[in-house]
């Protein structure tokens, strides 16, 4: 889901995975990507929660939403983690304030973009164009 802040991308993504999880009785996880990366970084040196264990756990969750792609501090490390998560998944919803898939590819790389769009053709992505923030009062 791509579009400006406040237009309902996260709300819709949460509603979708909650509905699917409730119907299928399978686990789902909604997490902001910056928060996820902070948790992984905070676990450095913790044998119980290595990067590989985080990635393995996230790979097993049937339905995952990675919220706010592009809001994290982008580094080679964060790109590597994101690549590993997406490379091991099939059903992932991603929300971002970046305007297009080309923007995502330019910020990250083609390999990450390819994995982020796994199983999705160009007609099945959601763009929230021309919408104003729902958080602001409009006069």
What label would you give each PLM region?
Residues 1-13:
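Walker A/P-loop nucleotide-binding motif
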Residues 52-62:
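Short basic/glycine-enriched coil/helix segment immediately N-terminal to the Walker B
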Residues 25-37:
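Short beta-strand-centered segment that lines the nucleotide-binding/catalytic pocket of NTP-utilizing
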